[in-house]
Amino acid sequence: MYKRQAIGFQYLDADFEEEMIHAGILDSIEKGFVIKNTKLNRGAVIVRVSESTGLYIYGRFKGDEFIYEYYFPFILGKTSCDNDEITIERHLDKESFAVVCDESRTGVTLIFYLQNVMDYLEFIFDKDGLKQKEYNIDRKGSVYRIPIKNKKVSLTALSIGGMILLPSHRKVEPVKAKKEQDEREKLIQAAKKGDETAIENLTIEDIDTYNELSQRILKEDVFSIFDSSFMPCGVECDQYQVVGEILELEEEINHYTKETVYIMVIECNNLSMTVAVNKADLLGEPAVGRRFKGQVWLQGSVAFKAVSYTHLRAHETK
């Protein structure tokens, strides 16, 4: 899993990885960083790597014994966004999940890797959730086709390489930018409901933007024309190429390797996310106001309940 280098495991070999996972499981169980679902005999162990990063180790319980199946690195999100509807589906090769999310502000359909797996498994049975009496996690059933509406999502991303760009010269007054964004949101919502006028206005707006870019690209550098971008990258559906303004910046130290990790909140096309990147993999000096450009693995935590990030708290589903 090469993406682990984003949170400070640049030179992690197989032997050290196995030892770290084993020690992390024992230590986390002792400290109570364990989530268990007794209906499915599944569980997760949280290994903290720095203040806001860690490893999410998923497995199954056989009695009191925890049997490791897979893990993934994660970072805690610092922002959240609203969405109209999400659907969640299991990956074929293991008991991990992808989320398809219609982000309400931008109208963009996002696909990301679900962080809080155990919260979702609990939500399947919950009376305020999907209300499923029976659920076979090993079989692809109808539960994955049930839309989940109006849940906040905290987007995060891991990057194994990127560069820092200077800000673009174009400056828009905050009040004017907010007004334009609000108007665009209204058009997007109306278009989703079938409003032909809204669809036509959005189409004309896109054509005008395309024509303007086609003329300017002949004389200007592409990164001086636009402030940010967010687009799919590669063959994996949760990989994106992003350019975004850095709104917040912190440095954290990996407790195991002592490598430095940059934690950035960036804004891409009015979409905020928290990004982790290893200092050794970043070209340039990051600073608030500058821009980050790189390929990211998009993750997200869905607030199935009012309290977010319950996947970091020890609890048990009876």
List PLM regions with ranges.
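Short nucleic-acid-contacting surface segments enriched for D/E, G, S/T with interspersed K/R
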Residues: 280-293
